[in-house]
A protein has these predicted regions:
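ATP/Mg2+ or Mg2+-diphosphate-binding catalytic cores
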Residues: 177, 298-362
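ATP-binding pocket architecture of kinase catalytic cores
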Residues: 65-158
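Conserved NTP-binding catalytic cores of kinases and kinase-like/nucleotidyltransferase enzymes
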Residues: 2-7, 11-107, 225-228, 346-362
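An alpha-helical support segment within catalytic cores of ATP-dependent transferases
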Residues: 29-40, 159-160, 173-215, 225
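Active-site activation/catalytic loop segments of kinase-like enzymes and analogous catalytic loops
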Residues: 244-278, 294-310
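A cross-family kinase active-site recognition segment
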Residues: 134-187, 208-210
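Active-site acidic catalytic loop and adjacent metal/ATP-binding pocket
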Residues: 56-64, 71-72, 103-104, 198-245, ...
Length: 362
């Protein structure tokens, strides 16, 4: 996360804005606003507050008081009901000792405030560092796979439903909206996306294990201290969905480096995952198509954010949709990029691992 704006609580500098054209602060907070929020959540005496560049959807601030550091989020998209569902899920996960953010209560016992018609929450700051994808080693990836499987297992005990805002039908609807307004120079991209939707409509398997998924396991949503995973953040996209889709999204986000899928990274992530939850044969069979749908989902939603978001240009934070469009081309075998080894691992994954478990030890 990158510093955007800062204000000191004790006679320091006034609020300033740095390169706001690229920063995701949709709801600006003054020192007075922050002071009221700190008071309402009983966080202690304000020392400093910093607007954070993190994600493209919501507004975030890091607050420092004499009691420690806290993370403030203003939900710019979700309804109050949807925001409450996210809070409820986080509370459930914390009870199961899952390393996610901890929502805090206000003085009146609520876990959120209404701020200008939007849901505002405060969580404890998770210590550690967000590592760029090229700094993640096999130990990090193994830990991430293990944590994702743990989330999927813990999610079995969470019986409340959370609608999937990024399921296939929803992405189709978003694409139809976007497609009508795309500039003509993207016609080749439109052709590929049209074809991909036609393919996935026929070949996506909906009869796969489902449960609570994170939906957005990117490097900037995870913190480490050394090789130890300290926390998983940003449950904005969490919902009930296919578990293999969640793992496929993690592969797309974590195992793609220098324009190629890396089999060593893939094996480290999958190995960590399967120590807790071995994949079924149908999941292995569906893995390539779930990778394709994940790449398609992020291509479409990033195009939408870029071309259709109704916000002043100075408030936008741009994420290049072509990053995932390029992955999609590789997954479609229209471009080279390391998929041969990964596809082979998927094709033999179930039988190979079954053999390894049954093989007598020497």
């Amino acid at each position: 996360m990158t510093e955007l704006a800062a204000g000191r609580g004790q006679g320091g500098m006034a609020e300033t804005w740095k390169d706001s054209r690229q920063m995701a602060i949709y709801t600006a907070l003054s020192k007075k606003d922050i002071g009221k929020i700190v008071e309402e959540f009983a966080l202690g005496d304000l020392v400093n507050f910093t607007g954070m560049r993190t994600g493209s959807v919501n507004t975030h601030y890091l607050i420092e008081t004499k009691r420690g550091k806290f993370f403030l989020k203003i939900d710019e998209v979700k309804s109050e009901v949807e925001a409450k569902q996210e809070i409820d899920l986080l509370l459930h996960l914390r009870k199961q000792n899952f390393p996610c953010v901890q929502p805090l209560k206000t003085k009146s016992g609520r876990f959120h405030l209404d701020f200008q018609g939007k849901c505002l929450t405060v969580t404890r700051h998770i210590e550690g560092a967000e590592l760029p994808v090229d700094s993640l080693n096999s130990t990090h990836l193994n830990a991430l796979g293990h944590a994702l499987a743990n989330l999927h297992l813990i999610g079995r005990s969470y019986k409340k439903g959370i609608d999937n805002r990024f399921g296939y039908n929803r992405i189709v609807a978003i694409y139809r909206e976007v497609r009508r307004q795309l500039p003509s120079h993207l016609k080749n991209i439109v052709r590929v996306l049209d074809d991909e939707f036609s393919y996935l409509e026929s070949y996506l398997d909906n009869n796969l294990p489902k449960g609570i998924i994170h939906g957005d396991l990117f490097p900037d949503n995870v913190k480490f201290k050394g090789n130890r995973l300290t926390g998983i953040m940003d449950f904005e996209a969490a919902c009930r969905g296919k578990l293999i889709y969640d793992l496929a999204t993690a592969v797309n986000a974590l195992c793609f480096l220098e324009d190629r899928y890396r089999i060593d990274r893939f094996e480290a992530l999958i190995s960590g995952y399967e120590t807790l939850r071995p994949l079924s044969l149908p999941e292995w069979d569906s893995f390539p198509n779930e990778l394709r749908f994940s790449a398609l989902r992020f291509t479409v939603t990033r195009i939408k954010d870029f071309y259709l978001r109704q916000a002043d240009d100075s408030q936008r934070i741009y994420k290049d949709f072509k990053e995932f469009y390029d992955r999609l081309l590789i997954l479609r075998r229209e471009k080279s990029g390391g998929m041969e080894d990964v596809l082979l691992a998927m094709a033999t994954g179930y039988d190979y691992r079954k053999y390894q478990k049954s093989k007598p030890s020497k």
